[in-house]
Amino acid sequence: MFDCIDTQMMQNALALARLGRFSTSPNPRVGCVIAHGSQIVGQGFHVKAGEPHAEVHALRQAGEMARGATAYVTLEPCSHYGRTPPCAEALIGSGVSRVVAAMTDPNPLVAGKGLAMLEAAGIRTESGLLETEARELNRGFLSRIERGRPFVRVKCAASLDGKTALADGRSYWITGEAARADVQTLRAESCAVLTGIGTVLADNPRLNVRAFPTLRQPARIVLDSKLQTPLGSHMISDDLSPTVIVTAVDDEERLKPYRAFNHIRILRSSENAAGRIDLAALLPQLAELGYGEIMVEAGATLTSAFIESGLADEIVLYQAPKILGEGRSLLTLPANPAVLTSEGEWESRSVELIGQDVKWVLRKK
């Protein structure tokens, strides 16, 4: 079905798709290679929503050389008119003879229709080449479409003994400069960075990408059930990225000062029995806003709530070679004796040394 050249061309397409990992949201990351055998005549990737898709960039580069070629694309070509014309039509018009997709597009607007349109035009189509890699690349987009909620990554940083601060609350950078720079990359890949009102009041964070230039800043989401976010905080006064204030408050007079800021969006959500934002109810709301990949950067209470509720899909833990002793713990979870005699619900995906700190990535089994 697929030979070594097919595999190499799709690997090239996936590498191209990764170039858009900081900018395509809410669209998927897609790369395309057009080739005659091992000779590449055109290639491209989707850069930003509203701009040409990967196939169009590749076809423009290939020109007349696209005729009779094979197009390798990491996601099924679209078949509908959105902010851009259908890529399937562009491929048909180019004269390519074969299209290989890493995976079909689960978006109901496409969902096999793109490949069907190509086949109806006499173009041979195949799919499933390096599908696992393609799905991993678009885990956020796929989570939003298939599960109706974002992929949730929880970022943590702690000392070797699992502490985030001293007992009196004093804290500074737990991890080193290299690890903090790596966090900037995770932020840039995310559609949004989510935190709680406790972190806003204690630290007044910006939660934006500062380490390198990027075409878009991730949105910022603050869970603030009682509407306590100070109007002078960076979340409100800094308009570098859109900010969503999630609250249960329904008093328009209290909401009015926040609505005066163009980059602020008020999202009404329900509370749970503890008087905090109901996370399970919130995630589908965030998916409706187009957020597919969310990174949680919060204190122990909110971080623990995502993990305990089963809503965290990935944990990224940065652990520093420091021992704080008595202090504030990374998590506040109830005892779970079952894990002593079982494998647990998390599995290690990677362990990496970044500077002097260890980065540990875990995924839900």
Question: Would you name each region that the model predicts?
Answer:
Residues 16-19, 61, 140:
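Solvent-exposed, charged/polar functional surfaces in cytosolic regulatory/catalytic domains
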Residues 22-26, 115, 129-159:
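Proteins enriched for Cys/Gly/acidic motifs involved in redox and nucleic-acid/cofactor modification
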Residues 28-32, 69, 205:
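Extracytoplasmic/periplasmic beta-strand context in beta-sandwich domains
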Residues 36, 146-147, 363-365:
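Active-site beta-strand termini and strand-to-loop segments that position acidic
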Residues 34-133, 219, 239, 244, ...:
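Zn2+-dependent cytidine deaminase-like catalytic core
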Residues 32-33, 57-62, 148-151, 155-157, ...:
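Short, compositionally biased "basic patch" segments
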Residues 23-39:
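N-terminal glycine-rich anion-binding loops that anchor highly charged ligand groups
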Residues 2-20, 25-27, 43, 83, ...:
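Enzymes that bind and transform nitrogen-containing heteroaromatic metabolites
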